C-alpha cells in the first residue's frame, strides 16, 4: 500500500493564481475578462477557457511571462515542511496542476523533481501560445478540466493505495 498526496498548485502551493496574474498583466482585458467570467460561472470548461486565454498571448513573450511569474510567485508557508514530512513518512507527493509547465516546473524546481509534477504544456512554437493537455479528462470525467485531477489519480492509483488530495 502506498500513500499518495496529490496537491494543487495555483492558490494552494502558491498564494495566488498564476494564470490569473499572468493574464491580468499581459492579455487584453476586453478579451480576457469574458473568458475568465465564463470559466468561473462554468459556461466555459476550464480547458476551453484557459486554452482561449493563452491563445491571446504572443509566443515571443515567453521570457517576459516567466520572469513576471518568477518575481511574483510566493510559496505558501508550510509547503517545504509538508514535503519534508511526506519524505520522512514515505508518502508519495505529486503536484497536479491546471497550470503550465513553463512556470510550474521552474517555480517548483527547488522542491520537486519534474516527474512529480503533472500539468499542462504550453507550446510557444506558433505566433500565439497553444496549450497541450497531456492529463485531460478520461472516460470517467466529461468536465473539460484541462489537467484532470481525478483522471491523474485514477492513473496513479494501485489497489490498496490511499490517495489524499489537497
Kindly give the residue locations of the regions a language model identified.
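Active-site neighborhood of HAD-like aspartate-dependent phosphohydrolases
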Residues: 1-55
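Short hydrophobic segments within beta-strands
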Residues: 6-8, 96, 166
Amino acid at each position: 500500500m502506498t500513500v499518495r498526496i496529490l496537491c494543487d498548485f495555483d492558490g494552494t502551493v502558491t498564494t495566488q493564481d498564476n494564470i490569473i496574474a499572468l493574464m491580468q498583466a499581459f492579455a487584453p482585458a476586453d478579451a480576457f475578462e469574458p473568458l475568465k467570467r465564463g470559466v468561473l460561472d462554468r459556461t466555459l470548461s476550464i480547458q476551453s477557457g484557459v486554452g482561449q486565454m493563452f491563445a491571446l498571448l504572443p509566443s515571443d513573450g515567453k521570457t517576459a511571462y516567466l520572469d513576471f511569474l518568477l518575481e511574483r510567485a510566493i510559496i505558501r508557508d508550510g509547503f517545504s515542511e509538508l514535503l519534508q514530512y511526506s519524505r520522512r513518512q514515505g508518502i508519495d507527493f505529486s503536484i497536479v496542476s491546471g497550470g503550465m509547465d513553463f512556470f510550474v516546473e521552474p517555480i517548483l524546481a527547488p522542491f520537486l523533481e519534474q516527474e512529480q509534477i503533472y500539468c499542462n504544456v504550453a507550446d510557444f512554437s506558433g505566433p500565439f501560445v497553444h496549450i497541450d493537455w497531456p492529463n485531460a479528462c478520461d472516460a470517467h470525467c466529461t468536465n473539460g478540466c484541462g489537467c484532470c485531477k481525478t483522471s491523474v489519480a485514477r492513473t496513479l492509483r494501485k489497489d490498496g493505495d490511499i490517495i489524499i488530495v489537497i
